[in-house]
Regions:
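Active-site beta->alpha loop and helix N-cap motifs at the rims of alpha/beta catalytic domains
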Residues: 1-102, 110
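Catalytic alpha/beta core domains of metabolic enzymes, predominantly
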Residues: 81-87, 96-206
Length: 206
């Protein structure tokens, strides 16, 4: 479960409610990756440290969303604080220019030098940004995983960019169809022409 991701209505929950949800999921033995989106860095780091304390499996880390969006130094400090708050949890940095800030390769690798728990990059900016991430981030470091974040770029991400996972909104409504699409995309990436045709059709339909 990706809990309290960007589309997970976390602004509607109190901090206590969010953390109670994490604890309940972990207690129920459901693998849980925790979104750390918050209105300030202090709250984001609190969610990260709580996730590690109760036994979550990982973190999703997004930029500051309400202030100092374009500031590189502010965003680096924000990312670093979250990664430092849960050093034992693998973390994926989430890029989306909709937050007013684009995470690029220089910042990502600067953080990765300091934080070994930074293991992945999720791209939500669309096909062009996904291509950028593949060319300048994940292809430069084989230990960094590329995750797809836009429903309409699943085929492009797997087949053209070497993505290893997809975190989608449509998957909540059509889980079987999205899993089937991903299976077809993996086969297409390995050269299966029939799977490629079917994957493109299903990708466009969804």
């Amino acid at each position: 479960v990706i809990y309290c991701g960007s589309m997970g209505d976390w602004p509607l929950l109190s901090d206590e409610e969010r953390q109670e949800g994490v604890a309940r999921l972990v207690k129920a033995r459901i693998p849980t990756v925790v979104g750390t989106g918050a209105i300030n860095t202090k709250k984001a780091t609190d969610h990260a440290s709580h996730a590690q304390k109760v036994g979550a499996l990982g973190l999703m880390v997004i930029p500051r969303v309400l202030s100092r969006g374009p500031s590189l130094s502010a965003q680096r400090s924000h990312f670093a604080s979250i990664l430092n708050a849960a050093p034992n949890l693998p973390a994926v940095i989430y890029n989306s220019h909709y937050y007013g800030f684009s995470t690029r390769a220089d910042l990502f690798f600067d953080l990765k030098k300091e934080f070994t728990n930074l293991v992945g990059f999720k791209e939500f900016g669309g096909a062009k940004d996904l291509t950028y991430a593949a060319e300048h981030i994940t292809s430069q470091d084989k230990k960094t995983s590329l995750m797809i974040g836009v429903d309409t770029t699943v085929f492009h991400g797997y087949v053209n960019c070497g993505a290893v996972g997809a975190i989608t909104g449509v998957g909540n409504a059509f889980p079987k169809e999205v899993l089937h699409l991903i299976d077809l995309c993996k086969k297409a990436a390995n050269g299966d022409s029939l799977a490629r045709q079917k994957a493109k059709e299903l990708d466009e339909a969804l």
